Swiss-Prot record:
Record note on quaternary structure: Interacts with the C-terminal fragment (CT, residues 88-377) of cognate toxin protein CdiA-o11-EC869. Probably recognizes only the toxic DNase subdomain of CdiA-o11-EC869 (approximately residues 222-377).
Protein name (Swiss-Prot/TrEMBL): Immunity protein CdiI-o11
SUPFAM superfamilies assigned: NMB0488-like
InterPro entries xref list: CdiI_Proteobact, Cdil-like_sf
Length: 167
């Protein structure tokens, strides 16, 4: 896939023992889940090549929202709350979680950023039920790959980053 120089591409991965969700994020500076692209829900044991292909597609779908009106609409608080609630409801129904606590308890999150032919995969610290941060994560925990890495290498890199998640 071709990625533009000096353009940021974003994705986030959410993982539980029951699923792996590859999600496109868009924005400008601040990013958010892009409602134009449905989460790619995979089995946690998906092969690295397929996983890498889904990550590359999610990154390719990422949009830079450089028009102010577009950003204002994209980050509308009420719409964002509705979309987040729908995301939770979908995951709970599809995977049989009875409570949000059960859904989020063992969930890991990894952020992926691609810019200027470099993919940076950042593990996170699970702060509280629905919150992750970079606290307790060192830059040495990041997985950094060239953008022309094979899908298998990217999938493997994600698994390495997941193993470095904390909390």
């Amino acid at each position: 896939m071709a990625f533009n120089k000096d353009q940021d591409y974003w994705a986030n991965i959410f993982v539980t023992p029951d699923f792996l969700s590859v999600e496109t994020y868009s924005g400008l500076g601040m990013t958010g889940r892009d409602p134009l692209f449905s989460p790619r829900l995979l089995q946690p044991d998906v092969d690295d090549k397929s996983l890498g292909e889904e990550i590359l597609q999610a990154l390719s779908d990422s949009r830079t929202l450089d028009v102010l009106e577009e950003r204002v609409a994209f980050f509308d608080l009420e719409k964002s709350k509705e979309q987040y609630a729908a995301w939770i409801a979908t995951l709970m129904e599809k995977y049989g979680y009875r409570t949000k606590r059960a859904l989020f308890k063992n969930m890991k999150k990894v952020g992926i950023h691609l810019v200027n032919d470099v993919i940076t995969i950042r593990p996170s610290f699970h702060e509280k039920l629905e919150a992750w941060s970079g606290n307790r994560i060192n830059e040495s925990d990041y997985v950094v790959l060239p953008a022309d890495s094979s899908p298998t290498e990217i999938g493997s890199g994600l698994r390495l980053a997941l193993s470095r998640c904390k909390g």
